Amino acid sequence: YSTSFKKDLKVISNNAQKLQKTVEVLGMLQECGVEGIPRKMKPHKLIGQYKGALECHIEPDLLIIWEEYLDEREISLLRLGSHSELFKK
């Protein structure tokens, strides 16, 4: 995980519900990668500054961004936060 992700996680750690949902999604990612994420969470590839990374909605305005390395069966956690926090213009 990136330094930014660690900071983002610290910000939501005071909200038990968001933290629990985030931990559940991390478990899905660890187990099955993007294939483990339910369609209702809208997993998709990103363009722009996060080109090549993937994103899904933990809540309507709580997103997680990660990169997936299929050869090594690894993921790299990049960011966690709201649309406005992650996609500032």
Question: PLM ranges: what are they?
Answer:
Residues 65-66:
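Acidic, metal-associated active-site segment
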Residues 1-60, 69-75, 83-89:
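Basic, Lys/Arg-enriched alpha-helical interface segments
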